[in-house]
């Protein structure tokens, strides 16, 4: 069985819900307090075993600074861990441009000519954290590692799942044991098969490229990736990995991102005291 050594960071969307901010800075570069969102994803991928990271971007986005060597900044802030200043420092980086926004499946197609074997996928505006360390003693998320470990046991494609209170806003799954039996896109709440939803983490198998050709964008549109996952469900199987114990932060819209900032700051040991004191004072006014 081939090792999972490639990770695809999907960061091509225009971020319309985050305009006007996303007109000048990619939503994937927005900081969760002081650490860019994409830095969390890069370190998570490395923690899971990635040796090559493929960034799917659009023509108007530039990730060259974050993907480069920022060790020069250590002279200014020696307290910041090297892997946070230069989060891609220990992997090979490939940038692939999706010239026309045609959905998740088409975005993956932009990178697959450079990938042999299974690969991780991380959606660029979704951060999943199970530790809340600061910039001095940063500890990467284990979310993708959990999926890779499941793939290594089964050789089957895997999707990360999170329990939510508003499943009508997501792709919701019906499960049979650890197997995904159905994915329902944004169902009415009363029709949702569960409260488990896709949360932007995947391990896909090496047949993905052929399946994206079989279930083409021209026929399936932006549901192309769902058609591929349905193929796996109906054949050898698609594993659902519940990522309990993780906080899910979303940089794709203002209110969720603001809530993310506050929640994350309240969980960080180096910030929680001062931010809690300020919040308590502010809420009393």
Label for each model-derived stretch:
Residues 168-182:
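Conserved catalytic core of nucleotide-sugar-dependent glycosyltransferases
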Residues 23-39:
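Short catalytic helix/loop segments, enriched in acidic residues and glycine
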Residues 15-20, 168:
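Short N-terminal binding/cap micro-motifs at the start of the first secondary-structure element
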Residues 2-9, 17, 35-122, 128-129:
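Conserved N-terminal catalytic core of the sugar/cofactor nucleotidyltransferase
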Residues 81-92, 150, 175, 231-233:
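Short, conserved catalytic or adaptor-binding loops enriched in Gly and charged residues
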Residues 130-167:
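Conserved donor-nucleotide/metal-binding helix-loop-beta segment in metal-dependent transferases, i.e.
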Residues 133-140, 144, 148, 179-277:
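Catalytic-core segments of class I nucleotidyltransferases/pyrophosphorylases
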Residues 29, 173-175, 240:
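A structural signal for short hydrophobic beta-strand segments in well-ordered beta-sheet cores
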């Amino acid at each position: 069985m081939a090792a999972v050594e490639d990770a695809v960071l999907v960061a091509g969307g225009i971020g319309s819900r985050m305009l006007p901010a996303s007109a000048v800075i990619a939503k994937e570069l927005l900081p969760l307090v002081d650490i860019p969102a994409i830095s969390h994803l890069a370190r998570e991928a490395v923690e899971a075993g990635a040796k090559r990271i493929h960034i799917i971007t659009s023509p108007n986005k530039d990730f060259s600074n974050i993907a480069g060597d920022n060790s020069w900044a250590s002279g200014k802030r020696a307290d910041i861990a090297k892997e946070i200043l230069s989060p891609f420092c220990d992997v090979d980086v490939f940038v692939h441009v999706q010239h026309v926004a045609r959905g998740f499946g088409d975005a993956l197609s932009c990178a697959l000519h450079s990938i042999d074997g299974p690969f991780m996928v991380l959606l660029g505006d979704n951060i999943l954290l199970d530790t809340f360390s600061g910039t001095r003693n940063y500890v990467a998320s284990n979310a993708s590692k959990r999926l890779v470990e499941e793939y290594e046991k089964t050789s089957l494609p895997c999707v990360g799942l999170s329990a939510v209170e508003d499943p009508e806003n997501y792709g919701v799954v019906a499960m049979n044991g650890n197997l995904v039996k159905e994915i329902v896109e944004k169902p009415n709440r009363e029709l949702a098969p569960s409260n488990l939803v896709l949360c932007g983490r995947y391990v896909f198998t090496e047949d993905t490229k052929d399946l994206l050709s079989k279930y083409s964008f021209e026929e399936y549109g932006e549901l192309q990736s769902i058609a591929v996952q349905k193929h796996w469900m109906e054949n050898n199987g698609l594993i659902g990995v519940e990522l309990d114990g993780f906080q899910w932060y979303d940089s794709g819209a203002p209110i969720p991102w603001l809530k993310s900032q506050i929640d994350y700051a309240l969980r960080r040991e180096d910030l929680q005291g001062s931010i809690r004191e300020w919040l308590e004072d502010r809420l009393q006014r």
